Amino acid sequence: MNDKTLYKKISLVDYSVLTKIMISAFNEDTSMHTDLKEDGPTGYNDDSLIKLLNEHENFESYKIDYKNNTVGAYTVAINPNNEYSLEMLFIDPKYRESHLGSIVWKAIEEKYVDAKKWTVETPDYSKRNHHFYTEKCGFVFHRENACGNGAKSFIFEKQK
């Protein structure tokens, strides 16, 4: 753990703050890579996505506190055979230059040392995410996924 970065279980009182951060992070990524000003996964802008992720039986969700501020969150799905999935990772764009994504990913790998395989899915247009997962975290492209409405995502994997 970085001395400035803490990971705490998400509680109901965190939903509103985390949703605001999620809106900012997803909308920034969307506007950077598309003609849209705002977009994200269903429920990203009304507390329902963070609630769903946090309350799912096989998921573990943590908020990320940096310098005494909540700056994001992550959710890990724990699947059979030590195959894990990073369901969500978002960080407030104001903290992007702090390299928190890399710090958080390293902490996740240290927490889940028994993981033999990691999977993450991200929009096909999100070049910055592709770079982060492949160049910073060691994932490799696995396949493309058709999501409906013409949307696509890329699935990346990392084997240990």
What are the language-model segments listed below?
Residues 91, 97-110, 135:
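Conserved acetyl-CoA-binding loop-helix of GNAT-fold acetyltransferases
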